[in-house]
């Protein structure tokens, strides 16, 4: 019985050691992969696609407006078989930006009155 217990403890120790080694290898691989993804992201982030330009090459490359990032919207033009993708600002975000701009202007007027 002591032999079985000793053998079990030894087996458990070896198993946990090998698992730790495998996890270290996986962590190192994840770190390397993460670093390469970050480098690609930095390289891609240098140039953005302006509004109403083609974004089919990279659908996450649209530029930011004052508050929000534009969205790559794809559609099929009438009578066309090819998909067209352009960077556009959704209407609800457009209205939110207009409201924020008006609020800023109104805040400036209040500051002048009570300033």
Curated annotation (Swiss-Prot):
Keywords: Disulfide bond, Knottin, Secreted, Signal, Toxin. Residues 21-44 form a propeptide. It is found in: Secreted. It comes from Lycosa singoriensis. Disulfide bonds join 48-63, 55-72, 62-87, 74-85. The presence of a 'disulfide through disulfide knot' structurally defines this protein as a knottin. InterPro entries: Spider_toxin_CSTX_knottin, Spider_toxin_CSTX_Knottin_CS. Belongs to the neurotoxin 19 (CSTX) family. 01 subfamily. GO terms for molecular function: toxin activity. It holds the Pfam family Toxin_35. One of its GO terms (cellular component) is extracellular region. Expressed by the venom gland. This is U3-lycotoxin-Ls1a. It comes from the Eukaryota. Residues 1-20 form the signal peptide.
């Amino acid at each position: 019985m002591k032999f079985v217990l000793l053998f079990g403890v030894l087996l458990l120790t070896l198993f946990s050691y090998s698992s730790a080694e495998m996890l270290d290898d996986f962590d190192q691989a994840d770190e390397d992969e993460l670093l390469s993804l970050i480098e690609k992201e930095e390289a891609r982030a240098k140039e953005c696609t302006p509004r109403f330009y083609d974004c089919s090459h990279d659908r996450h490359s649209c530029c930011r407006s004052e508050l929000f990032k534009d969205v790559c919207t794809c559609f099929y033009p009438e009578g066309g078989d090819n998909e067209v993708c352009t960077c556009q600002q959704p209407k609800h975000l457009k209205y939110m930006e207009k409201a924020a701009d008006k609020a800023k202007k109104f805040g400036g007027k209040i500051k002048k009155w009570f300033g």
